[in-house]
């Protein structure tokens, strides 16, 4: 890659009317590592992730992807570059199928036509879910799934982009213990593939179980970054 870090923020500042949400945040994310972001509510974690995923633009500062200064005008630009995000607030299309949710906006077309290739979409979704060991029917309507299963579909969707950076914002909030273990298995595999995982959680046991690096934010300011092994 020619650069030690796949993603960096330099002196990121984000100001909303009457509120400084982020003030001079500089972070570096390594490929093949899980980087946890810690901080109380209001620390600025979600705001920073929305900047990295193209939902917000920073007031000041820059984002670098593979050493190149980058600016996102909308989320699809960050996805195309190689950054995908699993949001804490799920936003599925409830009356569409699992496969339609996974490939929403990038549906495969029958060659030479404007028509969606439903068979390919179903087969690709099944292959993706099987690869992640998720027992979910690609054809089932999203509204018929449990919240936990919807969360796993969102995780599968993020993986389907084959992104270099995967942001997970409180991904276990609706998962059972066994589902958390399954998610951690997926995370470790992504890590082995050289992906950078940014992991946001309030659960200390999860952070120490899965993370390599831990950064702490407080009141929109950077406190420090530490090896997880030293904090545990």
Predicted feature descriptions by range:
Residues 2-232:
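Glycine-rich phosphate-binding loops of nucleotide-dependent enzymes
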């Amino acid at each position: 890659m020619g650069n030690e870090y796949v993603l960096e923020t330099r002196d990121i500042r984000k100001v909303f009317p009457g509120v400084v949400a982020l003030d001079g945040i500089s972070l570096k994310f390594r490929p093949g590592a899980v980087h946890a972001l810690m901080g109380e509510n209001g620390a600025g974690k979600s705001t920073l992730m929305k900047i990295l995923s193209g939902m917000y633009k920073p007031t000041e500062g820059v984002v670098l992807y593979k050493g190149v200064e980058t600016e996102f005008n909308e989320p699809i630009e960050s996805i195309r570059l190689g950054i995908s995000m699993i949001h804490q607030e799920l936003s599925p299309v409830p009356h569409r199928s699992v496969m339609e949710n996974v490939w929403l906006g990038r549906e495969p077309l029958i060659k030479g036509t404007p028509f969606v290739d439903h068979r390919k979409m179903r087969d690709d979704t099944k292959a993706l879910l099987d690869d992640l060991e998720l027992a979910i029917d690609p054809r089932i309507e999203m509204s018929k799934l449990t919240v936990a299963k919807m969360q796993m579909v969102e995780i599968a969707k993020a993986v389907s982009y084959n992104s270099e950076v995967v942001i997970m914002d409180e991904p276990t909030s609706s998962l059972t213990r066994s589902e958390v273990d399954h998610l951690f298995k997926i995370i470790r595999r992504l890590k082995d593939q050289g992906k950078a995982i940014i992991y946001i959680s309030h659960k200390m046991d999860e952070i120490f179980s899965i993370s390599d690096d831990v950064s702490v934010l407080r009141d929109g300011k950077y406190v420090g970054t530490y090896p997880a092994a030293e904090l545990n």
